[in-house]
A protein has these predicted regions:
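Extreme N-terminal starter segment of soluble prokaryotic enzymes
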Residues: 1-2
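PIN/NYN-family metal-dependent endoribonuclease catalytic core
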Residues: 5, 15-17, 21-49
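A secondary-structure boundary/capping signal
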Residues: 6-7, 36-37, 106, 125-126
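Alpha-helix capping/helix-boundary segments
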Residues: 9-10, 40, 109-110
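Hydrophobic/aromatic ligand-binding patch that stacks against planar heteroaromatic rings
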Residues: 26, 64, 94, 115
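Active-site neighborhoods of divalent-metal-dependent phosphate/nucleic-acid chemistry enzymes
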Residues: 69-103, 108, 112
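Acidic, PIN/NYN-like endoribonuclease modules and their adjacent C-terminal/linker elements
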Residues: 108-140
């Protein structure tokens, strides 16, 4: 399953003390494919370095870009589907070009995507994504 993780969800997932740490562990175990772009990686790096630590940022980014279950895309078209926070469109564009199942985000700016019929981009909250991963593990 291909997904795009928004930055806040990645930050929640990388903390071993967070209830969503299993999302990061499942990524490391190859249970889903993370779809990224250079822009997304840059944001991950900047936000983790600023809010947590530069060393952790370097480790997380290195881990992501060296995994086999990562799809790196370079969108050639910007869809501009999110007007409230244009910066979030990098996640939308990545999801579209990577044919991701959904974007994992708790950000309300993504809610507008539920009303846009084309191109269809599904968005789920991180708690639902964790349940999806747990359900997938149970059916294996």
């Amino acid at each position: 399953m291909r997904v795009v993780l928004d930055t806040n969800c990645l930050i929640m997932a990388i903390s071993a003390r967070n209830e969503y740490y299993q999302v990061w562990q499942d990524f490391l175990d190859g249970k889903y494919v993370l779809c990224i772009t250079n822009e997304i990686i840059e944001e991950y790096s900047e936000v983790i370095a600023r809010n947590i630590s530069p060393l952790l940022s370097e480790f997380v980014i290195s881990t992501i870009i060296n995994r086999k279950n990562v799809v790196m895309k370079s969108p050639s078209y910007a869809f501009h589907l999110i007007k409230a926070d244009e910066d979030d469109n990098k996640f939308v564009d990545c999801a579209i070009v990577a044919n991701a199942k959904y974007i994992v985000s708790n950000d309300r700016h993504f809610d507008v995507l539920r009303e846009i019929p084309f191109p269809k981009v599904d968005v789920i909250k991180i708690n639902q994504f964790l349940l999806d991963l747990q359900n997938a593990a149970e059916t294996m």
